[in-house]
């Protein structure tokens, strides 16, 4: 009887186990010359940028992180004079821990075209992102709606539509 209660208690405890929180790693994969996996330490060593955004409630919040364009260039996405012709027919698929996905074009981030500031943030208001916001978040301050700001982001896949 005691053994049955112990086993029942252990099994019940397993039902309460929660999924482990996301780890602060970010990968850039796809048809690239130098696919990357960046950890929190790697991101901390890269040049930082701060952006201000309006939250849903109208409050202004600052996010800090690394310019996504710089990460993409390190991974070997077409940039500068390479971003022409067939390279323009490509996209970036951002993937979050919870399955959420968003598409970006490479040209919208390029300084030669859209020059849109998008950062891979690890801090909000000077504090590390946590809970359902982090540990990493793509922040798109120029968007009127926040649907392309991807919380719990883990990866970007570079996809060429024309080879």
List where the protein language model places each region:
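Serine/threonine-rich low-complexity intrinsically disordered regions
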Residues: 1-3, 31
């Amino acid at each position: 009887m005691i053994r049955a209660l112990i086993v029942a208690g252990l099994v019940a405890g397993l039902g309460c186990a929660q999924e482990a929180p996301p780890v602060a790693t970010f990968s850039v994969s796809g048809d690239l010359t130098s696919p990357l996996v960046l950890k929190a330490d790697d991101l901390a060593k890269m040049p930082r940028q701060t952006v201000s955004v309006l939250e849903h409630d109208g409050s202004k919040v600052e996010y800090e992180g690394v310019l996504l364009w710089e990460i993409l260039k390190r991974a070997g996405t077409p940039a500068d004079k390479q971003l022409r012709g067939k390279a323009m027919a490509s996209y970036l698929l951002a993937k979050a821990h919870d399955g959420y996905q968003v598409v970006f074009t490479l040209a919208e981030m390029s300084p030669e075209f859209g020059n849109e500031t998008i950062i891979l943030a690890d801090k909000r208001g000077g504090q590390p992102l946590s809970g359902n916001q982090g540990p990493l978040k793509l922040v798109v301050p120029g968007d009127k709606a926040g649907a392309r700001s991807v919380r719990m982001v883990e990866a970007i896949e570079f996809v060429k539509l024309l080879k």
